[in-house]
Amino acid sequence: MIELDGITPSAQMLDDLAAEGRPVILNFSRGKDSIAVWIELERRNMQVIPIHKSIVPGLKFIEDDLKRYEDYFQTHIVDLPADAFYRMLNNLTFQPPERCAIIEAAAFPSPTREEWDMLMRDNFAEDDTWILDGVRATDSAQRRMAIMRHGPIKHRTRRQSVIWDWGIADVRRAIKDRGITLGPDYEWFGKYLAGKVNRRHKGGLDGNGRSFDGIRYDFLKPIHDHAPDDYQRILHWFPLAELELMRMDMINGSV
């Protein structure tokens, strides 16, 4: 773990939250960091309201993975469409011309993050419930700068990054000690970077995979190969996403 002058250590943050004796909302992405947060919350016997946000609703490999975590933690996970889902629809991402007028007439909501937080609290918790995430300062230079500038506790928005000082080794150790297996994402995603084969890809907990995070070749190609029904589900919402595969295959000389 790291230390930054003047910033509250994550262990103290977690202990303070536990002392409040109130439920907390966990932004649960199924990624390593959010799993590590849940482990720490459970260790302190805290009541967790886990909320997952699906970039594309109804993907079976994600639903199956959420069920696995529900069984492990013995807690229901709320699964909502992500704000990115509505944003992509409103921006007509991968939409054929005949759908554009229909989508524009539907006027789907495009809530900001703070509005989304308010909706989560209104429906599943109290107005002042803390929302927790697994943002870590060592994950990237940008995140380290954000932690140094704004701190891991945002009182105005009632958000906390409660493992901000953990390194990736700390995350892996926490998950390994509990015997938790990561979802298929960590085997599938990371094989491609910017449409090219990533020869340094390594799956599993000790690898460099990642959870599903967008509709682009790096994610679409593995879903196409490993979960064809889910790939068709993506095309149901974003029909022209298939052009992403065609485009990169042409660039890479596969067709």
Where are these regions (language model features)?
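Nucleotide-activated chemistry modules centered on ATP-dependent adenylation/adenylyltransferase
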Residues: M1-V255
